């Protein structure tokens, strides 16, 4: 009897597999027939179902565009069609088109991350929602970041955590810098968002869950128990539960007077539901945790290979320290004097490529120059191509912070990260070689 059940279960599995394969193949043929030769960019659609996804995601050094993009751009040009993440796609390595895509969010394009990512990010994440809900959640995040970056309380937290972390290194022969800096960024986020101190057990629990979360974020998105993806989905659920418990505790205590963290501000406004509040807190924690930590690790790597840059950076921070009293804390005016530090951060962002590309989808037919981008197609603006374009950057493979002579406009989240990194670097370069 057991063998018979196993036989039928295998037959059903194969049947569902064939039906799924057929559906995706017919969908692909339908979309292509709906857009026959409408000035589509040249390109290759690759294999059925997976298309060219595996080749596109093949690991490569962060200071290059990788063999896939190099080969396709040399054959098809800077803009080409492909089949990626189970969808027909337009890949753009053209700086002008990339800017056009980013400047026309919600008008011509919307976020379109693969469905399995929703299981990790959550259905209300800023990366997965669109339209009015996206605007609503984004406005909350932007208001928090804009109000936080220059407040004495936030600046004091950044400096205090920087100093305490480096103090903890003194009795150790070696450290794992990437782990240490992730601990620094998550402790800073939970302190400023939720008033949780680094030494509290819950802070360590949140760090562990975020580490598990990130392993699944870049893994094969198949939910099989024990895989990185399945563990990440569970970690996200635990993080949501942790934040939800804190929210309900605050509400039960009638929002403790004087706490003044981000969660208190949201709860007092009463503009978000509980699930929206949980999601926006986790989104800000994710952005402040992974991208900031990765960028800071890259900066240390680049400085180790550029002694002249390190020396110039050290001189800038020595001058700032000499202008202050002993143990006088850094302030917003000090940050504004860190001009070369800002250039180092911008150059590390260019050379390190923390964010290689983003997922977008055309919500209507879009004509750009001689190309047509059909409605419903995935659009992937690739930023690394512009970062290493010799027409935009002289000697693009060289780490040269002095190339940044113009103040670039960055998103509010990037500005917050720059403050954290600048204060951390201040104490790092003055205390370590």
Q: What are the residue ranges of the model-derived segments?
A:
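N-terminal membrane-proximal hinge/A-helix region immediately C-terminal to the signal-anchor transmembrane segment
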Residues: 2-136, 157-164, 235, 364
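Cytochrome P450 catalytic-core helices
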Residues: 185, 291-316, 414-432
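Cytochrome P450 heme-binding Cys-pocket and its upstream "meander" loop
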Residues: 63-71, 110, 270-279, 384-419
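Cytochrome P450 I-helix active-site segment
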Residues: 39-45, 49, 155-159, 206-217, ...
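Hydrophobic mid-domain F-helix/FG-region of cytochrome P450s
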Residues: 20-24, 86-99, 123, 140, ...
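Cytochrome P450
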Residues: 2-21, 83-90, 149-160, 169-191, ...
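Cytochrome P450 proximal C-terminal region
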Residues: 2-21, 41, 73, 162, ...
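Conserved cytochrome P450 catalytic core segment spanning the I/J/K helices
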Residues: 146-150, 171, 186, 217-218, ...
């Amino acid at each position: 009897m057991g063998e018979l059940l196993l036989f039928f279960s295998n037959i059903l599995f194969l049947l569902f597999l064939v039906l799924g394969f057929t559906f995706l193949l017919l969908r692909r043929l339908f979309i292509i027939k709906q857009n026959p030769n409408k000035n589509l960019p040249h390109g290759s659609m690759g294999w059925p179902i997976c298309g060219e996804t595996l080749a596109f995601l093949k690991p490569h050094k962060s200071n290059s565009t990788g063999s896939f993009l190099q080969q396709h751009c040399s054959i098809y040009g800077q803009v080409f069609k492909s089949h990626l993440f189970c969808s027909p796609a337009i890949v753009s390595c053209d700086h002008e088109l990339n800017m056009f895509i980013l400047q026309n969010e919600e008008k011509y394009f919307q976020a379109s991350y693969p469905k399995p990512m929703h299981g990790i990010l959550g259905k209300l994440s800023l990366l997965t929602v669109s339209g009015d809900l996206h605007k609503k959640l984004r406005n909350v995040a932007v208001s928090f970041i804009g109000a936080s970056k220059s407040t004495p309380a936030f600046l004091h937290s950044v400096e205090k955590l920087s100093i305490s972390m480096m103090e903890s290194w003194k009795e150790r022969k070696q450290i794992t810098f990437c782990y240490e800096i992730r601990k620094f960024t998550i402790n800073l986020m939970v302190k400023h968002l939720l008033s949780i101190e680094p030494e509290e057990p819950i802070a360590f629990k949140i760090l562990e869950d975020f580490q598990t979360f990130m392993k699944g974020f870049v893994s094969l998105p198949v939910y099989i128990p024990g895989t990185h993806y399945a563990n990440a989905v569970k970690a996200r659920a635990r993080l949501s539960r942790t934040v939800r418990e804190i929210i309900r505790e605050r509400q039960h205590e009638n929002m403790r007077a004087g706490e003044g963290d981000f969660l208190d501000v949201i709860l007092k406004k009463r503009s978000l539901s509980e699930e929206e509040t949980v999601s926006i807190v986790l989104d800000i924690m994710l952005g402040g945790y992974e991208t900031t930590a990765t960028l800071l690790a890259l900066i240390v790597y680049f400085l180790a290979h550029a002694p002249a840059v390190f020396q110039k950076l050290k001189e800038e921070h020595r001058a700032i320290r000499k202008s202050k009293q002993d143990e006088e804390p850094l302030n917003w005016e000090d940050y504004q004097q860190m001009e070369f530090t800002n250039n180092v951060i911008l150059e590390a962002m260019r050379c390190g490529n923390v964010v290689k590309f983003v997922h977008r989808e055309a919500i209507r037919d879009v004509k750009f120059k001689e190309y047509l981008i059909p409605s419903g197609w995935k659009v992937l603006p690739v930023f690394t191509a512009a970062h290493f374009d010799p027409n935009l950057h002289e000697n693009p493979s060289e780490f040269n912070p002095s190339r940044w002579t113009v103040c670039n406009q960055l998103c509010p989240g990037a500005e917050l990260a720059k403050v954290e990194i600048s204060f951390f670097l201040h104490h790092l370069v003055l205390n370590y070689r």
